[in-house]
């Protein structure tokens, strides 16, 4: 009941004198946005490990803060898994274990689904890891347009 909520919030504001803001929540961006990255290195540590340019701690904080495993575009249901991690020095910068569509290799693109709700508002530049660029995809003509990209000055300016 929207009108009852509006009336309640107006009464609360009048009683408390506080400004009240409603955060829209993830519903406005649920199932929207993908986070695309690249495998930078592959090695064996008892299982295949891939270091990516995507950081769980910097770009996907729910992976660390909550029991959350983001879905990956074109992930296979079976086969040998690779543990994907980020480039920061944080020991827990682990995205998770995934079965990639191809043999893992340096330069391989990966894409995580449903990332708009946090990859834009909770990102950080811990350890100098850059913020992800924001691109728009036009599904009618398959064109990509860069809306915003970030460089070292974005890191510097967040500190001052």
Please annotate each region the language model reported:
Residues 1-24:
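Acidic, glycine-rich loop-and-beta core segments that form the ion-binding/anion-interacting portion
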């Amino acid at each position: 009941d929207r009108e009852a909520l509006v009336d309640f919030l107006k009464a609360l504001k009048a009683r408390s004198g506080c400004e009240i803001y409603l955060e829209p929540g993830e519903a406005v961006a649920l199932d929207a946005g993908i986070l695309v990255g690249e495998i930078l290195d592959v090695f064996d540590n008892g299982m295949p490990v891939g270091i990516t340019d995507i950081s769980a701690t910097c770009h996907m904080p729910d992976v660390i803060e909550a029991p959350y495993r983001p879905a990956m575009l074109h992930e296979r249901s079976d086969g040998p898994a690779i543990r994907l991690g980020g480039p920061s020095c944080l020991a827990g910068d682990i995205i998770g274990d995934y079965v990639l569509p191809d043999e893992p290799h340096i330069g391989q693109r990966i894409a995580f689904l449903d990332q708009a709700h946090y990859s834009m508002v909770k990102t950080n530049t811990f350890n100098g890891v850059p913020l992800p660029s924001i691109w728009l995809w036009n599904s009618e003509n398959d064109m990509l347009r860069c809306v915003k990209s970030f460089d070292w000055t974005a890191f510097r300016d967040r500190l001052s």
